[in-house]
């Protein structure tokens, strides 16, 4: 009997200790948060995927395991190709990524790339974009002398660039696709083959479908600032723009908003527009500024 008791004692003690096992064993590492949605990054004028190495590091650090794709299309001078041509190329690249992400994706689109992405959201019937983050993008157009323009059109100034941009030849350059001269609005409306269409400023047979598609987006995050130095006016990053007197009218004063021509008013009404202005950031440093990332980008990468 004593021998039998000694044989059973370990089993009895094991039963008594079972409730306390979680306290006795070392704690298991906390599991990672559920998988993050894939992130697609679209670069700007004269850019390439290499420019976004810091942004890639920030995302990997704060949201480990996130699949980030920086699309390597229309790099360098190829970014001057007509924007509709670029939209088609980027569309072919993003469709397979979206198809593999039934929970949705996020878009981070920088400068000219923000216009490419807005057009993508307009023409894609089945896109599944949750956050569209427009990073210092001339969403209402550009009207300013920049080094890019001086290099491309050395004999022109912003006051007479409309003569080139609002011609069939000029519309073959991406910059002219969103050149918005407030002193020649009639020419802009008639000649713009890109911005006037995605803004719904000129009638076209796809306007209703494009608006419906754009409104599929979960959230529109607008980022820009007064020290950008390239986007002119800088409020274009927030859908503000000049009137004929070069007074800036904010988004809520713009005809495209008041008419809700492509969905801005609807998005704002449902609380789906986030505006994140930040001073002290120059145009070429938006995607490498950690403070900006933490405040304006990271919160929307679910």
From Swiss-Prot:
Q: Where in the cell is it found?
A: Lysosome
| SUPFAM superfamilies documented for this protein | alpha/beta-Hydrolases (SSF53474)
Q: Which residues form the signal peptide?
A: 1-27
Residues carrying a glycan: 60, 190, 206, 245, 289
Q: Is Transport found in the keyword set? A: no
User: What stretch or stretches form a coiled coil here?
Assistant: none
Active site residues per record: 111, 228, 283
Q: Which InterPro entries match?
A: AB_hydrolase_fold, Palm_thioest
Gene3D superfamilies recorded for this chain? alpha/beta hydrolase
* Disulfide topology: 109-117, 165-176, 276-296
Biological function: Catalyzes the cleavage of thioester bonds from S-palmitoyl-CoA or S-palmitoyl-N-acetylcysteamine (unbranched structures) but does not have activity against palmitoylcysteine or palmitoylated proteins, branched structures or bulky head groups. Conversely, hydrolyzes both long and short chain fatty acyl-CoA substrate.
What family, per the record? Answer: Belongs to the palmitoyl-protein thioesterase family.
Q: What is this protein called?
A: Lysosomal thioesterase PPT2
What organism does the UniProt record list as the source? Rattus norvegicus (Rat)
- Gene symbol? Ppt2
């Amino acid at each position: 009997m004593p021998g039998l008791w000694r044989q059973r004692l370990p089993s009895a003690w094991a039963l008594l200790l079972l409730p306390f096992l979680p306290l006795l064993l070392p704690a298991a590492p906390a599991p990672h948060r559920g998988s993050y949605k894939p992130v697609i990054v679209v670069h700007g004028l004269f850019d390439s995927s290499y420019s976004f190495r810091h942004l890639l590091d920030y995302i990997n650090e704060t949201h480990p395991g996130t699949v980030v794709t920086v699309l390597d299309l229309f790099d360098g001078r190829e970014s001057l190709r007509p924007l509709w041509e670029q939209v088609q190329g980027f569309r072919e690249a993003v469709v397979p990524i979206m198809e593999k992400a039934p929970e949705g994706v996020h878009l981070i689109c920088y400068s000219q790339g923000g216009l490419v992405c807005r057009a993508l959201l307009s023409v894609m019937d089945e896109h599944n974009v949750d956050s569209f983050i427009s990073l210092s993008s001339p969403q209402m157009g550009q009207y300013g002398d920049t080094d890019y323009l001086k290099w491309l059109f050395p004999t022109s100034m912003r006051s007479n660039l409309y003569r080139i941009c609002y011609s069939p030849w000029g519309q073959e350059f991406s910059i002219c696709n969103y050149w918005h001269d407030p002193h020649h609005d009639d020419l802009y409306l008639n000649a713009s083959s890109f911005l006037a269409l995605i803004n719904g400023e000129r009638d076209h047979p796809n306007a209703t479908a494009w608006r419906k598609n754009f409104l599929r987006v979960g959230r529109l995050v607008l980022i820009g600032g007064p020290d950008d130095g390239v986007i002119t006016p800088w409020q274009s990053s927030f859908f503000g723009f000049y009137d004929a007197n070069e007074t800036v009218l904010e988004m809520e004063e713009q005809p495209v908003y008041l008419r809700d021509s492509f969905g801005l008013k609807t998005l704002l009404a449902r609380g789906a527009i986030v505006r994140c202005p930040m001073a002290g950031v120059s145009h070429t440093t938006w995607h490498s500024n950690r403070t900006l990332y933490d405040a304006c980008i990271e919160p929307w990468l679910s």
